[in-house]
């Protein structure tokens, strides 16, 4: 039963069922009730009439239902479709009205009158009798002007056309296409096109097609296809005071291409594009007169629907060939029969090509170029279809699914992806011209193409390229790490060098052979495709980012002379590394016989910038992993390793010869960073010194002098447990020279293990530094923001010489000589004061000075400010207390004398390379010099202060030499590994190491007694009123702050990514803490700093194996 008749049922039954009953009642009752009966009867008649009108409207609406819906529409479907049409028209009307005269761009807009429009229309329509011009308003939608021949073309009256909306003339199924192509924002101005008409033969506007009818009854209307070109104009009329935006359309009627005037046979060509699912994506406008369909009729529908049922299976074979020759020039296949709009069939000779997505390697769409071979029987392709073609939707769906699954396979052809020689549908005509498809599409790929590469061949080629690239990468890494060593270090001679050279030469020859074979492979195969080049590029990027474990763990500065092939081997055991280290020391011991005379001549007093860059790059190599494997060395080996070597000749050679440009390297970046930091600090200091308060700040900095002592002895494990920031800015610990004559001169095992990996010092002709010349270490790395090369000297000999040593060192370094007393040091100019580094020894204090160019951390204040470079660890810890009470008192007296005369000495050290530490940090409450003197007595005990977290580094402090800043940074060492303050250890270290759970407050009180007198507030009190900032921070209540935070969290909660249940299960298999909804526990690593062995060398090796990711160079 048709639901269309549902509204008529109650209306039709009502008068028949209820009418007689009412009449019978009126006959039995009196005349007073007759009046009520007549009124109710009239109401029923009105109801019936309204019901009949409703049925007529619904039937009329069903006529406008889209023709694509082959099923009979119901009343509900018709009403919904009508509602959607109303909403669409209303939305477009609102959009046009919102533009108004101000919505469109008004630059260079020409306003036309109605007379001008008439002249324009007659000018462009007089050449073609099937063309007319129509202008409709964007605000009202009504026609403002229409040509005279429009009534003849549309077979309608002229008066009717002037009073109607232009959209009312369109077929309902074409309204959406009309609105999509006439949006004012995308229409070109008419005057702009006419000005460039001589340059362009075609109009810049994009044409579209619609069916338009004239007047008459709706049932007798006949829609004809028209080609429309829209333009934007502004019309001024008497009804509108302001110019009104309008659309000028040039409408041309389309005739069948097989009727007069016929399209030539050799020009009956059009192109189509469809998806792997056989759905039309694009249809050439040349197909409209040849097939009778408008582009919007075909787009979105299946191509199989329009093919003859017997030709549909051919599409499977066609798409199989499309997959086989994807990316190649077009190929031809069997002709197919295509159904036109009037129900007749035309035979098409088609050539097919495809576009391959270069990323997914799948066919994205298929391009068909079709040429009509035979015309349809009924040449009027726009005629109404008499009989409906029977189509089996089930068969079409099965074929579509089969073709879609076929084209889901990736393409492995070696040819370049894309259209091949076809280009695109627009550029296609440049290749194919107007000739037949068989003549223009080129030869078939079976004849001239190379044999297709199989998947196994592609994989073999990729693997071969990968092996070659990996070997080249290893060779480049070995060359980059060995070359600086050869220039800055004394190369060992012997069997090891020959073995390294032979292995390196073997690798070079092998790489050359592989490269040559790769070149032969490239000559044999055809030109590489985009996919092959992309694959090779991915392999190269993978190899570049890939870090070999051997390169990580065996990157030893200045001793890494092994070849890349040896680096690829696993890490040797502890015993083998010990033997290698001892053997290396024996070799170098034999070579430390030649005297050094370069210091006398002063060939190289300072290093060049290139040497700085190279050494800073070398110093970034990590020696922490090998130091963990190296066992304690014998005392004589340590003594030999610590003796100065003559390396000045190499340094002068580097400075004189210069360096070859190697591009952007770590050394170049380090030098650049050093330069930028130096410039920044210099500008900041200059700004402060030139301010009105420069003198006050300079004086204030001298009044706040503090002191501290330094101890070397941090292990590589300590630097590795530091966290992410410490890993980025690692630095090498200085080898601590030990006086072997002293009974307590025994190094910590981990500190001793560092020595083979450090840059060793050259031999000296005289055991005394006062002899032939002072030999400096090749690179003294200061724990500053960047590694720096700084001149230094053997501390063990300098400590025993006293005043003469200071004078000799000053002469050798090119600086004013140091006298025994502190007055000579205080007499240095401010430039030297800024770059002073204080080194405390057990016997006599020594204050080496560097030139200003080597300033690792220039002061942020005035000259002589207390903000100095980080103190260099220069002394190894003593495992046993060897100094007597008398020597302790002497150290204390010397320190007090120096601290009184040297107000610029400060213990506010900063951490390694961190740009954020350039900012001023407020110190913790510090104790005064008097309080330190009171606490530093002959009976003062030494304390080992452990941070809040046992997993972090521990610092052993000395009671008589501790300062207030040491208290601040020792407490902060638990949360950050950037602290570089070290303190000398004594016999109390073993006691504290056994009981590490002492309260932090108690340890702090014992280590730093009375450290609460001087604070930052005393400095603020002495600061003038005009210097202090005068703004006030507004008060914020606790409840208000919590409320705002809660609102922000709630607003951000919806933006947070959520895991799906499957992802949670997958993660839970690896991370068990996800089930409990808790944070993962942090791993704890304990580092040993005391001289007693907190963990054996084997434990260190286990930590290295468990945490390979932290062991980075």
Swiss-Prot record:
Induction profile: Exhibits circadian oscillation expression in SCN, liver, skeletal muscle, testis and eyes. In the SCN, highest levels during subjective day at CT6 and CT9, lowest levels at night, CT15, CT18 and CT 21. In the liver, skeletal muscle, testis and eyes highest levels at CT15, CT15-CT18, CT9 and CT15, and CT9-CT15, respectively. During subjective night, unresponsive to light exposure.
Listed Basic and acidic residues bias regions: 566-580, 889-901, 993-1007
Region CSNK1E binding domain: start-end pairs: 551-750
PAS domain boundaries: 120-187, 258-324
Disulfide bonds: none
Domain PAC: 333-376
One matching Pfam family: PAS_3
Phosphoserine sites (modified residues): 907
GO biological process: circadian rhythm; negative regulation of transcription by RNA polymerase II; protein stabilization; regulation of circadian sleep/wake cycle, sleep
Effect seen on changing residue 359 to E: Abolishes homodimerization
Polar residues bias (residue ranges): 428-441, 501-530
SMART domains for this protein: PAS
Major localisation: cytoplasm
Sorted UniProt keywords: Biological rhythms, Cytoplasm, Nucleus, Phosphoprotein, Repeat, Transcription, Transcription regulation, Ubl conjugation
Quaternary state and interactors: Homodimer. Component of the circadian core oscillator, which includes the CRY proteins, CLOCK or NPAS2, BMAL1 or BMAL2, CSNK1D and/or CSNK1E, TIMELESS and the PER proteins. Interacts directly with PER1, PER2, CRY1, CRY2, and TIMELESS; interaction with CRY1 and CRY2 is weak and not rhythmic. Interacts with FBXW11 and BTRC.
Name used for this protein in its record: Period circadian protein homolog 3
Source organism of this protein record: Mus musculus
